[in-house]
Regions:
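Surface-exposed helix-capping loop/turn segments at secondary-structure junctions
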Residues: 163-165, 264-269, 377-386
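C-terminal regions of mature proteins
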Residues: 366-396
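N-terminal Rossmann-like or analogous alpha/beta NTP/dinucleotide-binding catalytic cores
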Residues: 1-96, 100-227
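Residue-level recognition of the N-termini of beta-strands and the immediately preceding loop/turn
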Residues: 92, 124-126, 165-168, 237-239, ...
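Non-membrane alpha-helical secondary structure
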Residues: 29, 36-40, 342, 359, ...
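General N-terminal targeting signals
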Residues: 111-112, 143, 186, 303, ...
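Active-site cores that bind ATP or allylic diphosphates and position pyrophosphate for catalysis
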Residues: 3-5, 9-13, 19, 23-24, ...
Length: 396
């Protein structure tokens, strides 16, 4: 079902009232959103073509994961992955991370469920980084708020089933990370970072959500360090990075760093295996709620968020409007742990929503109920202590 992008005056008025903006401001946001949507669609295709990423569907498996079509249904493309099935599981690591700038969006939930599934079915040691110090540099958020949210994220992901015997969840306030950061930054240049910007950089810049130019570079170096750390500290041969395609620059730059570290004489080269590899799994994207390109924790109206009230969740899912029906389906498929049979039922209801909207609405109510359970779990994960910044940074 293809939805037109013409915005009516009534829609403009409703959005203006909800966002507490003038109609002119909303119209201007919409104009930018259309440009960003067109740009992002072209850019995603160009990234895949220019970097020669391999698209799904594909018959590739990752240590038997993928035999039930999981990779084809949840990922868009991959890079340098085939070799990883030949490397023993105990020589591999999975690395991903989440910025604790706000409550999890549907996009964040999607990434969490994907990495939990990868950990469970591959048996690969998994690192999840809650990047409070990276977010301090990349977003305009108070440090205490980021620390508090980081505690909540860690508790929440553990409650969802993260296996601590086969992985670790940590923040960026970590000695080993600081050591590896120095190694990574020693082989990076400003040009490397400027030539590999995040796809949504212009949108975040327009909305005044970014830190300064230097701090953004620091933030991105934090992420490269996350990827390199298992290779340096744990002597792993391979790191697999599950991430959205709009953030493909992270594993791409990390591979550049790794190649340079292998060549840097005088000690750095001895800290990485010469046969070390970095691969990436690029997940399918959930679109932002109309008119935004992607769901972002930093843009509340773009996303469905576990911090939303029950009334907001009902409005965004049940009363989403025809422009967002497909976004809700994307969420159901990607941001849930529903069984394959239940997902087939949801897809069928969506495909027939014009003639049988009642069945589709029933599916949406089931998903709303699922999200409310997650919301309750998120709220139960809240960090109860008052934040003492010094204690958190230097004692805990």
């Amino acid at each position: 079902m293809k939805i037109g992008l013409n915005l009516s005056n009534d829609e403009l008025k409703e959005m203006a009232e909800r966002q507490n903006k003038s109609i002119e401001e909303v119209a201007n946001d919409y104009k930018h959103a259309l440009k960003e949507l067109e740009y992002s669609n072209k850019k995603l295709g160009k990234i895949i073509k220019d970097f020669k990423y391999t698209k799904f569907p594909n018959d590739i498996r990752l240590h038997n994961y993928g035999k039930n079509n999981e990779l084809n249904s949840k990922y868009l493309c991959y890079d340098n992955l085939k070799i990883f099935s030949k490397i023993p599981v105990n020589e591999l690591a999975i690395v991903t991370g989440f910025g604790p700038t706000n409550s999890p969006t549907a996009g964040t939930l999607c990434s969490i469920f994907r990495v939990l599934e990868l950990q469970k079915y591959t048996g690969i040691y998994t690192h999840i980084i809650i990047s409070e110090l990276s977010a301090l540099n990349s977003r305009q958020k108070p440090l205490n708020e980021l620390i508090q949210n980081a505690h909540q994220f860690i508790s929440f992901i553990k409650k969802l089933g993260f296996d601590e015997k086969k992985g670790e969840i940590r923040t960026h306030n970590h000695h080993d990370h600081a050591r590896v950061f120095a190694l990574v930054s020693s082989v990076l240049s400003t040009r490397d970072l400027l030539e590999n910007l995040e796809m949504t950089n212009d949108m975040y810049k327009r909305l005044q959500l970014l830190g300064n130019d230097f701090s953004k570079m620091v933030s991105r170096t934090y992420t490269m360090t996350d990827i390199i750390l298992p290779i340096v500290r744990d002597k792993k041969r391979g790191v697999i990075v599950p991430v959205g395609l709009e953030e493909h620059h992270h594993p791409h730059l990390a591979r550049i760093v790794l190649d340079r570290m292998k060549l840097k004489k005088g000690g750095v080269d001895s800290l990485v295996r010469q046969d070390a590899e970095i691969g990436a799994l690029y997940g399918r994207l959930i679109s932002g709620l109309f008119p935004y390109v992607k769901m972002s924790k930093s843009i509340p109206d773009s996303s469905i968020n576990l911090g939303d009230s029950l009334e907001e969740l009902h409005r965004k899912i049940i009363d989403c409007g025809k422009r967002n029906e497909e976004v809700i389906l994307q969420m159901i498929v990607l941001a849930s742990n529903w069984s394959p049979g239940k997902l087939i039922k949801a897809k069928s209801a969506f495909e027939n929503l014009i003639t049988d909207y009642k069945s589709w609405k029933k599916i949406k109510y089931e998903y709303l109920k699922f999200l409310i359970k997650l919301k309750t779990l998120w709220e139960k994960s809240e960090y109860q202590k008052e934040i003492d910044t010094y204690q958190e940074m230097f004692v805990s």
